A protein has these predicted regions:
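Acidic, PIN/NYN-like endoribonuclease modules and their adjacent C-terminal/linker elements
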Residues: 3, 110-148
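Structured helix-beta-strand junction loops
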Residues: 35-36, 79, 135
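Helix-adjacent hinge/juxtasegments
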Residues: 53-81
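Active-site neighborhoods of divalent-metal-dependent phosphate/nucleic-acid chemistry enzymes
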Residues: 81-127
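Alpha-helix/helix-capping structural signal
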Residues: 9-10, 44, 88, 130
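Short, well-structured N-terminal submotif of metal-dependent ribonuclease cores
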Residues: 1-41, 58-68, 147
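Short beta-strand segments at enzyme active-site cores
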Residues: 40-43, 126
Length: 148
């Protein structure tokens, strides 16, 4: 059994039936769950989900209301295991940020990796593998590699 953290883009596509990636993501998540893999989410990916879901469609968002987004977030919390925010996350994040000299927007993805390390999660499922740095203990997985 493998443990996967679902990246924000995976969650967004899983709830956006109009997305060209919807079927790929749906198939991948169903495959993982039916093969006894565990799928996790964290507060950060839910916060990022909210940002994109409530942003207007004209600026690359989903254009949802707060109420629609709240329902979607509750569904995600009910469907996947929500990882606890622990004090170790900041320490791990700071160590990764300084060791790898990460700056700018990549810091957000680095924090996801810190959460994964703090909880001994082995894999991150994402549509954007290049957003993540290479960390020996973490395998970054694109849905195509699971569904091929």
């Amino acid at each position: 059994m493998t443990h996967y953290l679902l990246d924000t883009n995976i969650l967004l596509r899983s709830r956006d039936i109009g997305s060209p990636d919807y079927n790929l993501i749906d198939r991948t998540i169903r495959y993982l769950i039916s093969n006894n893999h565990r799928c996790f989410i964290t507060a950060q990916v839910l916060i990022e989900f909210w940002v994109v879901a409530t942003r207007p469609a004209a600026v690359n968002g989903l254009g949802w209301t707060s109420e629609e987004t709240e329902r979607a977030v509750q569904m995600l919390i009910n469907q996947f295991e929500l990882l606890e925010e622990t004090p170790d996350i900041f320490r791990i994040w700071l160590s990764l940020a300084t060791t790898h000299k990460i700056s700018g927007k990549r810091i957000h993805d680095l924090r996801i990796q810190a959460v994964v390390l703090a909880h001994n999660i082995s894999h991150i499922l994402t549509l954007n593998p290049k957003d993540f740095i290479q960390v020996e203990e973490i395998t970054i997985v694109h849905p195509h590699s699971i569904n091929s």
